[in-house]
């Protein structure tokens, strides 16, 4: 990997698009020709088409039997001024069977000047005159935010949250240990992380959150980040109308009931019909639909069935006074022909924004999935419901959905299923979509009249619904293939210019615990090619992008928390990832996160995997910067693993188990149980299995509260010694300076 420059960044060039506005005013003497006019009076309408822009075809309404129509309809196009843009105007006659073209004209937009507004006449068939009003202006307010900095809403949240945490930490730690908390500048930024792992991760994280809530640790956290299964629990918790007034204890009881049912009950004919009809509505509006949409509906029906209309934006009310940690969710953008271990862009989701920090491009959550061009929305859709995002965040399970439901007839269970998920790559779930162009630009000119169009759409819907129903209720190719299972959305970076530049990196002077040389970077954790192509850019010409479960690259959401602008001091991570056995080393995902961080020049403590050989399996491990005076920006990590150790002997910290029943309920294995009750592919948890896993992680967390408190005290001291402790100051990020490109292109000696 010696060819990789660790300071390489891909940024979006600041650029401007043009907004071209057309008002179709009127037409006079519309004719079908002498013979045609004898048979019928025209029913005219106008189609506008610019091939170089998305959402390229527009049309007016039609008037029955009117040769002098007055439309006064306004249409807007977003244009790239660097392309040749030609407006094609087609005068149409609406007919019952198929509409008729009455004439076509073109107008080259390069003749328009910015700020100009004019009326332009067009003549058809030497008789008909049509008047269009045209204007051109610069799009000065794009819908994407181009910046590496945090959004203003998150900055405001952080300031409010620090005020709350200051008082909460004093209460938690006591006056002596919190004596260093003089102001909000002394408040450390604490982040809590949950891994993927299906319902095992979700149930385990529910126990964790109960313990953190009861102990007061949650009140001291700024961020809560989840991946796949943990993100499902976070979605369930934050979308609950009674949270945070009602704590996880009550909400977890509802969750236990919801996951006790057979998932096949979700596939009753009535429910399937409702799912598919809802998806048809999305498809017919012009949005891509994949199996991940269906999976999201099933997850939603299981976990948030009484609030299926909830959106990510609506979760703002849970943090509007900084009363809870800011929830962060994630997925990956992947390429069809590249393993996600080699290339993946991390996409982050919060109630405030969705975007990719790699490129510094962010949008409001309600715009995710809308059609963009050059940073401006050209077609806005309704905000995707939260359950759609839950399907995307955990989409690895839609790949082997037949295994989840047990409809394939396969008898393989347990570790075999884990291994199968382990071997999935993005190439298995992302089809190479050859039909990337807009459907609308491929349509023939004209449409049928409203009645015929309605009949045509109804036939299409019936056919599509029938195919989807048959695929869902039978062991069809849809279950047996992994192709095309990824989530798919319109590419919000379509048409942008990406510039590979080499900044005077704000990270370059940071001293990490151990600088990685080429040999260390080449050391594989899971795959010889891991992260080989992470510096490659997204394809800004592709009209749609594929988004998949982040666990397909590594199973902990560290990239969200390691964003330099967030300046996190203490990370408490909970790893529910599958292991070959209960006695296997638990650091694979953490080592991948470390390697990713080092390759991106982000501070990260050295993870010593040999601590497992020296100390054996423990409930949690602490990894610190060895020299905090030098490694001023390196966070401390407390890493909890899924292990049943002290829980077998104690029903609460310091309270031994005494009765036979108490001992039997705690005597279980996680990964060595031949019945595999905690398999990643288990989507039904009987009450006993739920309670065992929930109570285990509740105990493990409470049993190590002092470890967390001590780390908080140390983090306060680090803050006092280094008042500006933050990986990158927000002002520096916005003021980045770049090397001269000509200098960079000079040959090296």
Swiss-Prot record:
Kindly give the SMART domains that the UniProt entry links to this protein.
Answer: C2, PLAc
Q: How is it modified after translation?
A: Phosphorylated at both Ser-505 and Ser-727 in response to mitogenic stimuli.
Q: Name one GO biological process term.
A: phosphatidylcholine catabolic process
Kindly report the protein's main subcellular placement as a broad class: cytoplasm
Keyword set includes Ubl conjugation:
yes
UniProt keyword Ligase present: no
Pathway per its UniProt entry is: Membrane lipid metabolism; glycerophospholipid metabolism; Lipid metabolism; arachidonate metabolism; Lipid metabolism; prostaglandin biosynthesis; Lipid metabolism; leukotriene B4 biosynthesis
Single annotated GO MF: lysophospholipase activity
Region span, Disordered: 427-456
Q: How is its activity regulated?
A: Activated by cytosolic calcium, which is necessary for binding to membrane lipids. Activated by phosphorylation in response to mitogenic stimuli.
Quote the record's binding site residues for Ca(2+) 2. 40, 43, 93-95
List-wise, which residues carry Phosphoserine?
Answer: 2, 434-435, 437, 505, 515, 727, 729
Query: Which residue numbers delimit the C2 domain?
Result: 6-122
Q: Where in the cell is it found?
A: Cytoplasm; Golgi apparatus membrane; Nucleus envelope
Region (Phospholipid binding), start-end ranges? 1-178
Q: Where is the signal peptide?
A: none
A GO cellular component annotation in the UniProt record: nuclear envelope
User: Cross-link named Glycyl lysine isopeptide (Lys-Gly) (interchain with G-Cter in SUMO2), where?
Assistant: 541, 606
Its UniProt entry gives the catalysed reaction(s) as: a 1,2-diacyl-sn-glycero-3-phosphocholine + H2O = a 1-acyl-sn-glycero-3-phosphocholine + a fatty acid + H(+); a 1-O-alkyl-2-acyl-sn-glycero-3-phosphocholine + H2O = a 1-O-alkyl-sn-glycero-3-phosphocholine + a fatty acid + H(+); a 1-acyl-sn-glycero-3-phosphocholine + H2O = sn-glycerol 3-phosphocholine + a fatty acid + H(+); 1-hexadecanoyl-2-(5Z,8Z,11Z,14Z-eicosatetraenoyl)-sn-glycero-3-phosphocholine + H2O = 1-hexadecanoyl-sn-glycero-3-phosphocholine + (5Z,8Z,11Z,14Z)-eicosatetraenoate + H(+)
Instruction: Check the record and name the PANTHER family matching this protein.
Output: CYTOSOLIC PHOSPHOLIPASE A2
Record function comment: Has primarily calcium-dependent phospholipase and lysophospholipase activities, with a major role in membrane lipid remodeling and biosynthesis of lipid mediators of the inflammatory response. Plays an important role in embryo implantation and parturition through its ability to trigger prostanoid production. Preferentially hydrolyzes the ester bond of the fatty acyl group attached at sn-2 position of phospholipids (phospholipase A2 activity).
Q: What is known of its domains?
A: The N-terminal C2 domain associates with lipid membranes upon calcium binding. It modulates enzyme activity by presenting the active site to its substrate in response to elevations of cytosolic calcium. In the presence of phosphoinositides, regulates phospholipase A2 and lysophospholipase activities in a calcium-independent way.
Write down what this protein is called.
Answer: Cytosolic phospholipase A2
């Amino acid at each position: 990997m010696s060819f990789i420059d660790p300071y390489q960044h891909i940024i979006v060039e600041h650029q401007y698009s043009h907004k071209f506005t057309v008002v179709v005013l009127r037409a006079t003497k519309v004719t079908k020709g002498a013979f045609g006019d004898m048979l019928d009076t025209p029913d005219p309408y106008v189609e506008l088409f610019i091939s170089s822009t998305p959402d390229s075809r527009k049309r007016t309404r039609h008037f029955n039997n009117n040769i002098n129509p007055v439309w006064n309809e306004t249409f807007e196009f977003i244009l790239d001024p660097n392309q040749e843009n030609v407006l094609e105007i087609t005068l149409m006659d609406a007919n019952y069977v198929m509409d008729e073209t009455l004439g076509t004209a073109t107008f080259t937009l390069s003749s328009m000047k910015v700020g100009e507004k004019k009326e332009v006449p067009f003549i058809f068939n030497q008789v008909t005159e049509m008047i269009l009003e045209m204007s051109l202006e610069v799009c000065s307010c794009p819908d994407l935010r181009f910046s590496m900095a945090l959004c203003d809403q998150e900055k405001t949240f952080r300031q409010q949250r620090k005020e709350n945490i200051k008082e909460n930490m004093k209460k938690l730690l006591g006056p002596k240990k919190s004596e260093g908390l003089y102001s909000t500048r002394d408040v450390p930024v604490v982040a809590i992380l949950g891994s993927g792992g299906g319902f095992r991760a979700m149930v385990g994280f529910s126990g964790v959150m109960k313990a953190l809530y009861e102990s007061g640790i949650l009140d001291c956290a700024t961020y809560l980040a989840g991946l796949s299964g943990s993100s499902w629990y976070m979605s369930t918790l934050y979308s609950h109308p009674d949270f945070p007034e009602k704590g996880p204890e009550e909400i977890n009881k509802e969750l236990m009931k919801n996951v006790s049912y057979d998932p096949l009950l979700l596939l009753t004919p009535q429910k399937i019909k409702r799912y598919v009809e809802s998806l048809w509505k999305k498809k017919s509006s012009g949005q891509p639909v994949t199996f991940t949409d269906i999976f999201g509906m099933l997850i939603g029906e299981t976990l948030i069935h009484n609030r299926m209309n909830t959106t990510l934006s609506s979760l703002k009310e849970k943090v509007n006074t900084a009363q809870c940690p800011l929830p962060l969710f994630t997925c990956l953008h992947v390429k069809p022909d590249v393993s996600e271990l080699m290339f993946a862009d991390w996409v982050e989701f919060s109630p405030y924004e969705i975007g990719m920090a790699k490129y510094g491009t962010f949008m409001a959550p309600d715009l995710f999935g809308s059609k963009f061009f050059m940073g401006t929305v050209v077609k806005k859709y309704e905000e995707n419901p939260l359950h759609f995002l839950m399907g995307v965040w955990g989409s690895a399970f839609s790949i082997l959905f037949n295994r989840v439901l047990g409809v394939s007839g396969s008898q393989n269970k347990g570790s075999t299923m884990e291994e199968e998920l382990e071997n999935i790559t993005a190439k298995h779930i992302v089809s190479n979509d050859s039909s990337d162009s807009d459907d609308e630009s491929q349509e023939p000119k004209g449409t049928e009249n409203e009645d015929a169009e309605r009949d045509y759409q109804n036939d299409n819907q019936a056919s599509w619904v029938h195919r989807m129903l048959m695929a869902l209720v039978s062991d069809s190719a849809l279950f047996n293939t992994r192709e095309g299972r990824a989530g798919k959305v319109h590419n919000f970076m379509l048409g942008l210019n990406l510039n590979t530049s080499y900044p005077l990196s704000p990270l370059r002077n940071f001293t990490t615990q151990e600088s990685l040389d080429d040999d260390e970077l080449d050391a594989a954790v899971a795959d010889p090619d891991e992260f080989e192509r992470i510096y490659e850019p997204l394809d800004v010409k592709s009209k749609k992008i594929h988004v998949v479960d982040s666990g397909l690259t590594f199973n902990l959401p560290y990239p969200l928390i390691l964003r330099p602008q967030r300046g996190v001091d203490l990370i408490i991570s909970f790893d529910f990832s599958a292991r070959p056995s209960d006695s296997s080393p638990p650091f694979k995902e953490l080592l991948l996160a470390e390697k990713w961080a080092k390759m991106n020049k982000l501070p990260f403590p050295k993870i010593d995997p040999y601590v497992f050989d020296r100390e054996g399996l423990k409930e949690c491990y602490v990894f610190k910067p060895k020299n905090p005076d030098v490694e001023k920006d390196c966070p401390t990590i407390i890493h909890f693993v899924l292990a049943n150790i002290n829980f077998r002997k104690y029903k609460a910290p310091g309270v031994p188990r005494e009765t036979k029943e108490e001992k039997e309920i705690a005597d279980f294995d996680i990964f060595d149980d031949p019945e595999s009750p905690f398999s990643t592919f288990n989507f039904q948890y009987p009450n006993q299995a739920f309670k065992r896993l929930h109570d285990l992680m509740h105990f493990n967390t409470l049993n190590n509260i002092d470890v967390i408190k001590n780390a908080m005290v140390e983090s306060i001291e680090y803050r006092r010694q280094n008042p500006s402790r933050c990986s990158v100051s927000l002002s520096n990020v916005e003021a980045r300076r770049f090397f001269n490109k000509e200098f960079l292109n000079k040959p090296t000696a």
